[in-house]
C-alpha cells in the first residue's frame, strides 16, 4: 500500500527493514508483545556534533545509554545513543548512516519519497506532559518552533482547548516532531508522515488502501501550517500514517513561528476506527 521497499538482505522472520531511498532502511518493523510504535532516530552531521550532543545531555543530567557497536551495526550507523524525552518516548541519536549500494525501487512504482536532507517525514506524539516535552525538544534537542496550534478538537464548547507544538530540526522540512496535549494513545504515537513527489501518487495510495481494506482515518485535505496535501490511514501498529505531497520548506532565517487555529483549509475529515 505505502510503496516502501523491503531490504531483503537485512530482513528475517522477526524483523522487516523497509527502505524509502538510498538508506539501508527508514522503518524497522519487528515482532513484539504489543502492536505499537517503539522508537525514533535522529541524525547529526558528524562525530563532533554527536560528541557535543552527548556532552550536553550529560551536563544537563539527562540519562542516556551508549548502545555500542552491535546495535550500531544493526542500525547501519557509526555510533548511537538512546534516551527518553519527558513524555517517555524512546529516542536514538546517531551519526554516519550507511548508504545502500542497491538502487531503491518502490514496490508500488512510486517515483520517490521526499527524504533527501529532510529525514523520513515527521512524528506526532500525544502526551499530558506537552509543556515539558516542548521544552525538551526546543531547549535540549535545539529544535525550533514552526507553528503552534491551539484549538478545541471537539464541537463541545465545554471541552478544554488543546495545543500542538510543531517543531523543526536543522533541515527545511516544516516539522519533524509534533507534540499534542492529549493522552498518550495505546499505540504510543498519534501519527507518522511520509511524503511523495506528486498528488497523483497520494490519490493512488488512497485507492490502494481502500482496495486492501485499510481503514481510512481521514479524507484528503490540505493542512494550513505546512500546506501538505494528504490523507491518513490506520497502520497495523495502531497509529496513523499520513501520506502526503507538497509540504512547504521554510527558510528558517526569515520564518516566524505561526499560530494556527484550525488544522486544514479543507478536507481532513477524521473517522477513527472503533477501539
Question: Where on the chain are the PLM-derived regions?
Answer:
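Core segments of cupin and vicinal oxygen chelate
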Residues: 1-25, 125-174
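N-terminal beta-strand motif that seeds the catalytic metal site of vicinal oxygen chelate
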Residues: 37-42, 98-132, 144-146, 187-194, ...
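A short beta-turn/loop motif at secondary-structure boundaries
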Residues: 10, 32, 71-75, 155-159, ...
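A structural feature that tracks compact, well-ordered secondary-structure segments
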Residues: 4-7, 28-32, 39-43, 93-94, ...
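A compositional/structural signature marking long, glycine- and acidic/polar-rich segments
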Residues: 157-224
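An N-terminus-focused feature that recognizes amino-terminal "leader" regions
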Residues: 1-80
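Vicinal oxygen chelate
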Residues: 31-128, 163-168, 184-210, 213-275, ...
Amino acid at each position: 500500500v505505502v510503496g516502501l521497499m523491503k531490504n531483503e538482505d537485512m530482513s528475517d522472520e522477526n524483523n522487516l527493514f523497509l527502505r524509502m531511498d538510498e538508506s539501508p532502511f527508514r522503518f524497522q518493523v519487528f515482532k513484539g508483545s504489543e502492536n505499537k510504535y517503539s522508537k525514533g532516530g535522529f541524525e547529526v552531521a558528524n562525530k563532533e556534533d554527536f560528541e557535543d550532543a552527548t556532552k550536553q545531555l550529560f551536563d544537563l543530567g539527562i540519562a542516556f545509554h551508549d548502545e555500542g557497536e552491535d546495535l550500531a551495526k544493526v542500525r547501519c550507523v557509526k555510533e548511537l545513543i538512546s534516551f527518553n524525552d519527558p513524555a517517555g518516548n524512546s529516542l536514538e541519536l546517531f551519526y554516519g548512516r550507511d548508504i545502500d549500494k542497491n538502487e531503491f525501487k518502490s514496490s508500488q512504482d512510486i517515483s520517490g519519497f521526499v527524504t533527501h536532507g529532510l529525514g523520513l517525514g515527521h512524528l506526532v506524539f500525544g502526551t499530558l506532559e506537552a509543556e515539558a516535552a516542548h521544552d525538551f525538544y526546543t531547549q535540549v534537542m535545539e529544535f525550533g518552533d514552526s507553528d503552534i496550534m491551539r484549538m478545541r478538537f471537539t464541537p463541545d464548547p465545554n471541552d478544554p482547548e488543546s495545543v500542538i507544538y510543531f517543531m523543526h530540526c536543522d533541515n527545511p522540512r516544516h516539522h519533524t516532531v509534533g507534540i499534542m496535549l492529549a493522552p498518550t494513545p495505546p499505540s504510543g504515537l498519534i501519527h507518522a508522515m511520509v511524503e511523495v513527489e506528486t498528488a497523483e501518487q497520494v490519490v493512488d495510495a488512497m485507492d490502494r488502501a481502500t482496495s486492501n481494506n485499510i481503514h481510512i482515518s481521514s479524507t484528503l485535505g490540505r493542512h494550513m501550517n505546512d500546506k501538505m496535501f494528504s490523507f491518513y490511514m490506520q497502520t497495523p501498529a495502531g497509529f496513523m500514517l499520513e501520506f502526503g505531497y507538497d509540504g512547504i520548506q521554510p527558510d528558517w532565517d526569515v520564518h516566524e513561528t505561526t499560530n494556527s487555529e484550525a488544522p486544514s483549509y479543507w478536507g481532513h475529515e477524521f473517522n477513527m476506527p472503533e477501539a
